[in-house]
């Protein structure tokens, strides 16, 4: 049973990793962090007038955002192992569109038997009950999805 866990570094995504590793005991786990180059991100963000923006790849051919996503996925895999997962593989994936679509695509690629997300992530616009990414994954994955809520304040 392969379990795909979406991880963006938010507290809710950390809770999702810890819950899955402790309660599901899946093997293997794939920890996914989705990234996109800065220029792609800026296509939907307002730009300050007159400020040139360039996206440069480093000497290793990687964008800074890709390196950050790889480090984030590795951190998520460490969290999963610390919570009891025997096998957790980090994966950084370049998003070519919405984050939820990349999660759904990777779930299909790895034939995940379950996709796990936190209820909310780091996205700026959030719905009142579930974050937009978790809601879209839930509706488009075509496979079981576990949305882990944040811990209660008094836990």
Predicted segments with their positions:
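Small/aliphatic-rich secondary-structure junction motif
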Residues: 1-58, 83, 87-89
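Small-residue (primarily alanine) positions within well-ordered alpha-helices
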Residues: 13-16, 20, 69, 107, ...
